[in-house]
Every structure is written in C-alpha cells, then in structure tokens.
Amino acid sequence: MSVRPTEITEILKQQIEQYGSRMVVTNVGYVVQVGDGIATVHGLRDVMASELVEFENGVLGIAFNLQEDSVGVIILGDYTGIEEGDEVRATGRIASVPVGPALVGRVVNALGEPIDGKGPINTDKFRPIERIAPGVVMRQDVDTALQTGIKAIDSMIPIGRGQRELIIGDRQTGKTAIAIDTIINQKGKGVICIYVAIGQKRAQVAQTVATLERYGAMEHTIVVAATASDPAALQYIAPYAGCAMGEEIMESGGHALIVYDDLSKHAWAYRQVSLLMRRPPGREAYPGDIFYLHSRLLERAARLRDDLGGGTLTALPIVETQANDVSAYIPTNVISITDGQIYLEPDLFYAGIRPAINVGLSVSRVGGAAQIRAMRQVAGRLRLELAQFRELAAFAQFAAELDPATKRQIDRGLRLTEVLKQPQYEPMPVEEQVAIIWVATNGYLDDVLVEHVREFEKQYLDYLRTSHPQILQRIASERELKDDLIQQLHEVTRAFKQSIWAPPQERVII
C-alpha cells in the first residue's frame, strides 16, 4: 500500500485549518509578606481596585492597596495556610454574593456561603457587593409607614419604607431588641428582612437566629453573620454583602428592611485593616475615608420611583456609644448620614422604662408623612403632653407644692409613659396602638393608678378584640378616626370602665 503525497498534503492542510492558537493570559503575582489577615503581593500588574484575587490554596482576597511595585490584599479567610512565595491569581471580577429568594430563611457568611448546615443555596444570580447608590431622580418621597410594632416609635418617631433610621445608645440598652421586634412585626406584611451581625459572638448570633425562628420570623429573614472570630476583612464587607441582597429585592419591586448590628464594630474592623495596610490614621486612629465607608453603604437605602418598580430598602443601622457620648466620631458621622435617630438611655432602661427611648432626643426626619392618618391624629397630642410633662417634671423637683393643673399634667405624663412601655418580642398592630394611645390622651387613664395602667391596657385591648372587633377593623381599613368612630370609642371605653375594668386586687397578708 503506497501513500500518495497529495493525501499527506491534504491531511496537513486540514490539521493546520483546525488548529486554533488561543492565548490565555493570566495575571499572576507572588506573596512577598503575609500576616494579620493581610498579604503584600508583587507582580499583579493589571489588578483593579477591590478586585478578587485567589491564593494558591484557594483562599480569596480583595486588592485593597494599589501601590507602585506591590498590591496590599485583605484575606477573606484563614491566612495561616498562605506562605511567602505562594502564587496569587487575579480573577478579573469584583467581590459578589448570591442574591434572590433562595437566601430567605438562611444564615450565610459575608461571602454568601451558607453556615446553617441546611445545604447549598440554589441560586444562579450574583451581585457585586459595592454599587453606586440610586441617584436623586431615581427616588421618590418616603410616605409609607414601616410599622415596627413598638408604640413609642410608631407614634412619635415614625419610620417610612426607604428611610434610614439610626438606633443609638450604650451597650445593653435594648438596641438589638428594637431591631428584632421590628423584624418580627414584618411577618405577613410582604417585607423581607436582612439582619447583618458584625463582630458579635457566635453564641449571640445563634441566640438571635433561635429567637427569630421561635417567633416565625426566619420565614422572611436572611441573616448575614461576620462574627468576632472571623477575619476583620469579612467583618468589613459583611454590611455591603447584606445590602446587595436587599438591593436585589428593592430592584425587583419588593420591600426590604436591613439591620446593621452594629456599625461601631464595622468601623473598628475597617480601622484595623487600614492601619495594618499602613494607611495614615486620623481622628481616633480612623482612616480619612471612614465617613465615606458608611455614607456609601447607607445611601443605598431608597424608595425607587414607580416606573422603576417602586421597591424600597429601609436601613436600621445600630451604633454603640461609650458613656452616652453621642459627640464621638462614629456616632456623629452616622447621625449626619441618616434620616433620624432613636436614642436609648441607660438611666431610662434601669428605671424600668423599656424600650428606653428618650423621645426628646430622638427624631425622625420623615415625620408624619410615614404615618397613617389615625396615628397622626393621636400622636400629635401624645407628643405635646409628653413634652409638657418633661418640662414640668424637672420643675416639680424644686417646688414644695404644685397647683392642681401642674399636678394633673404630671399625673397624665406618668400614665402616658407607662402606656409607652412594652415587653420584648410583643410588637403591637397599629390599630391597637391607636386605640390605647387615644384612650390615654383623652383622660380615661387619669383615675387609674400608675401601677395598674399596664393591666388596664391588657384588659381593654382584650375587650376590643373580643367584644368590639369592628372598631379595630375600621381603624385598620379606614386608616383614620372619623367622628362616628371617635364617638363609638368614647361609648365603648366608658362602658368598659363601668362594667368590665377590674383593677388587680392588692394582696392582704393576715
């Protein structure tokens, strides 16, 4: 059998035509120095700011400092397995997290990886953790209430969907409790909640998740946890990861609530990373861009225009103060960024006034626009009565005898303060809040002993639910107190006091 030269030529031609000379260019560098969760890498020539890089052992990092001859990388994982001389590859992408409905009910870390032992998250949608906030023309006014279920907040410091409301106070004053109650109260209201735990103990995060599960709130909640034992880099990116998950809901036309617990520890993590990277320190050793760290995060909360879906992302950042000092660096920064603050005081907390909200220093810059009309009708008088009470209470300490009008005002204030107390994990529907605040501001509690006010409230609301549910239904549906409804409330309240109300009997010891 002879091989003809023409056949050989034909085969060679086919081989040459089929050959594809594809060049794969990979941006590679080498670790020069590593330690304390950061690495200095030499040779990553075309790396982008905040680009993800991958180390030889599979651990990821973020290009944080871009210098002339090296790149400072923050390591998103265990840095103990990384050694000098290890290869580092640029991935060509910015840090992203999985987003979408599959995350609801799950506990994930700052990279969106599940840590609850319930298996993988089935989603093919990812979003970059850093994103420019919606512009002015993309937004619309905040005018829809986000009900927290907490009487003191919904009446005097209303929060709207798309607002940023700071919760600020010393440690152990009930900041997280307010946020958790708000999440529990969103059940059945079509709001997806994201709870971002930054720098907390793992046991504390587990306890929070257990509480949310006990009250059925995990069905509409995503928990993003970057605990105290996680690297500072993960604590730094955790809020941005949670925000990306919330933005997906907002841009899909849905409503999301995100709690950052807390931004003080977030600032500490960023300060730690920045100092290790040799960035110049400023006030309180924070880097110069610490304001931008929080402003670019909180500005992403918005209410979008209707033609963009009308979705909302509401932010409740938490900041811890030291010895009531709201003039420190981080508190003043976040106060200036947000649309109001809820200020919690240790003195009120230890006096048994819980939630320990100082309504004089707390404010919501959205105001009554985010309240239903019925709540606005009762809240105005409540605010005025409490303001007068605070003024007179300070004056009364120095007065030997009080005139009847002043004493009456102080007694009313004491009862209003008692009405605003509320146990933890018991958020109240807005129609019940309106009813009990109306009763208090219209003088029906003036002859009830202060220590019996809570029992009166319990019995009165039980009476409305069982005997007059139509009143609560009308408040909920009509969203205002019309004249005939007010008349009905007067009649029902008088009837309750005459025939139903039974004050607790004092125990007689023989």
From Swiss-Prot:
Q: Which reaction does it catalyse?
A: ATP + H2O + 4 H(+)(in) = ADP + phosphate + 5 H(+)(out)
Major site of localization recorded for this protein: membrane
Q: Which residues bind ATP?
A: 169-176
Q: Where in the cell is it found?
A: Cell membrane
Q: Which family does it belong to?
A: Belongs to the ATPase alpha/beta chains family.
Instruction: Give the protein's function.
Output: Produces ATP from ADP in the presence of a proton gradient across the membrane. The alpha chain is a regulatory subunit.
Query: Its quaternary structure?
Result: F-type ATPases have 2 components, CF(1) - the catalytic core - and CF(0) - the membrane proton channel. CF(1) has five subunits: alpha(3), beta(3), gamma(1), delta(1), epsilon(1). CF(0) has three main subunits: a(1), b(2) and c(9-12). The alpha and beta chains form an alternating ring which encloses part of the gamma chain. CF(1) is attached to CF(0) by a central stalk formed by the gamma and epsilon chains, while a peripheral stalk is formed by the delta and b chains.
Q: What is this protein called?
A: ATP synthase subunit alpha
What gene name does this entry carry? Answer: atpA
